UniProtKB/Swiss-Prot annotation:
Keyword check for Iron: yes
Taxonomy of the source species: Eukaryota, Metazoa, Chordata, Craniata, Vertebrata
GO molecular function: heme binding; iron ion binding; oxidoreductase activity, acting on paired donors, with incorporation or reduction of molecular oxygen, reduced flavin or flavoprotein as one donor, and incorporation of one atom of oxygen
Enzyme type, top EC level: oxidoreductase
Reactions that this protein is recorded to catalyse: an organic molecule + reduced [NADPH--hemoprotein reductase] + O2 = an alcohol + oxidized [NADPH--hemoprotein reductase] + H2O + H(+)
UniProt entry keywords in alphabetical sequence: Endoplasmic reticulum, Heme, Iron, Membrane, Metal-binding, Microsome, Monooxygenase, Oxidoreductase
Protein name: Cytochrome P450 2C41
Bilayer topology annotation: Peripheral membrane protein
Length: 489
């Protein structure tokens, strides 16, 4: 038979199979735009996927279905739908959804991209160990305060000249997480540290590009083609190779009775669990969970700080109020402490508003349902990917009047006291809430207050001309590059 005829027949069969699969499953799922064969709804989405999700929610409601390729994804938009799934039905929606590029990197190990018993074991261990290492206690606070001092000294070296804060802020947050995982910090000129930060920053930019959205929709097709996904694989291989070296060093020197850091605690657990089945405390899980913590603990915090400084340059009246509160509560010579935060409602509100406004990760990492779930009037089959729009919660007009405006009053009551909000989901919510939330909150408060205690921020242009629009909006919101001067006070 003519090869062309065979090809046409095969494609026709695939087309019919695709249409059948979509129509057969679609009856159980929420409504949504009609998908095209093979490619689904990908052509109907803007490169700013969050804008597309917002528009689709107006047409189909807060719960709707999209197809990325031939796989359905249920989208949750708005506070009520998000709360109902993440909190009220947390267990049923707790699995990790498809994220092919991350699955390729993690290999089914670690904490971020696993599900089921492995995820529960890794998460439980990580939370316990981070507490043992001082998360939420004065021990870890002292480490962050010490790093804040190094950060100040590095900023002084700029001599009040224009500088891009990206690298120095990355060094500070990276050193904190390194002290937890490896029990060591780097000098800000260390080439290994520079390499880490360059690769993490590059990965965040690439993950927020349209190419990765396409890769995650068609991994089998695009995996073997040239493209920026290969850069992500190469960068993570570099980081994992360093972590592997550190693990080997720890294997030769750790003391079971005196664990020094996260790796030591994991090695001890490996020895304790080596006869248990299924075996979860393995070398591969250690390597990947350390990479998970390293990546998540560095890039998100440093990018939030970088975006935060840009917003403070844009809004000098806010900066002045924060510095007045610092002078009143802490003074100029005493180091900020976490206990100061309760007496600094305006600063606390500013930190929350920075995170709300920048909306760093607009959609949570994909979830999946652990079983067939009856949700509202729909039935979502086991394993279906769930996309949760955190952006829709952080920009809800009912909770945050004029959400497009940067305004710390969103988190202040009429008396000027800090006002908590259930809508603040910058760290997600429920069973998959960020493991390092406590550490991130500590770093953001101590680093930002220390910087504003010691320096005046001077923009290079008129504040009204500062553009805070993200460079890219995909996996994350990538802040624009900028320079400023740190003027010692």
């Amino acid at each position: 038979m003519d090869p062309v005829v065979v090809l046409v027949l095969c494609l026709s069969c695939c087309l019919l199979l695709s249409l059948w699969k979509q129509s057969s499953r679609k009856g159980k799922l929420p409504p949504g735009p009609t998908p095209l064969p093979f490619i689904g709804n990908i052509l109907q989405l803007d490169k700013d996927i969050n804008k597309s999700l917002s528009n689709l929610s107006k047409a189909y409601g807060p719960v709707f279905t999209l197809y990325f390729g031939m796989k359905p994804t249920v989208v949750l938009h708005g506070y009520d739908a998000v709360k109902e799934t993440l909190i009220d039905l947390g267990e049923e929606f707790s699995a990790r959804g498809r994220f092919p590029i991350a699955e390729k990197v993690s290999g089914g190990h670690g904490i971020i991209f696993t599900s089921g018993n492995r995820w529960k074991e890794m998460r439980r261990f990580a939370l316990t160990t981070l507490r043992n290492l001082g998360m939420g206690k004065s021990d870890l606070e002292s480490r962050v305060q010490e790093e804040a001092c190094y950060l100040v000294e590095e900023l002084r070296k700029t001599n009040a000249l224009p500088c891009d804060p990206t690298f120095v802020l990355g060094c500070a947050s990276c050193n904190v997480i390194c002290s937890i995982i490896f029990q060591n910090r780097f000098d800000y000129t260390d080439q290994t540290l520079i390499g880490f930060l360059e690769k993490l920053n590059e990965n965040f930019r690439i993950l927020s590009s349209p190419w990765i959205q396409a890769y995650n929709s068609f991994p089998a097709l695009l995996h073997y083609l040239p493209g920026s996904h290969n850069t992500i694989f190469k960068n993570f291989a570099f980081i994992k190779s360093y972590i592997l070296e550190k693990i080997k060093e720890h294997q030769e020197s750790f003391d079971v009775n005196n664990p020094r850091d996260f790796i030591d605690y994991f090695l001890i657990k490996m020895e304790q669990e080596k006869h248990n089945q299924p075996l979860e405390f393995t070398f591969e899980n250690l390597k990947t969970i350390a990479t998970d913590l390293f990546g998540a603990g560095t890039e998100t915090t440093s990018t939030t700080l970088r975006y935060g400084l840009l917003l403070l340059l844009k809004h000098p009246e806010v900066t002045v109020k924060v510095q007045e509160e610092i002078d009143r509560v802490i003074g100029r010579h005493q180091s900020p402490h976490m206990q100061d935060r309760s007496r600094m409602p305006y600063t606390n509100a500013v930190l929350h508003e920075i995170q709300r406004y920048i909306d760093l990760v607009p959609n949570s990492l994909p979830h999946a349902v652990t079983c067939d779930v009856k949700f509202r009037n729909y039935v979502i089959p086991k394993g279906t990917t769930i996309l949760i729009s955190l952006s829709s919660v952080l920009s809800d007009e009912k909770e945050f009047p004029r959400p497009e405006i940067f305004d710390p009053a969103h988190f202040l009551d009429d008396s000027g006291n800090f006002k908590k909000s259930d809508y603040f989901m910058a760290f997600s919510a429920g069973k998959r809430i960020c493991v390092g939330e406590g550490l991130a909150r500590m770093e953001l408060f101590l680093f930002l207050t220390t910087i504003l205690q010691k320096f005046t921020l001077k923009p290079l242009v008129d504040p009204k001309d500062i553009d805070t629009t993200p460079l890219a909006s995909g996996f994350g919101h990538v802040p624009p590059t900028y320079q400023l001067c740190f003027i010692p006070v």
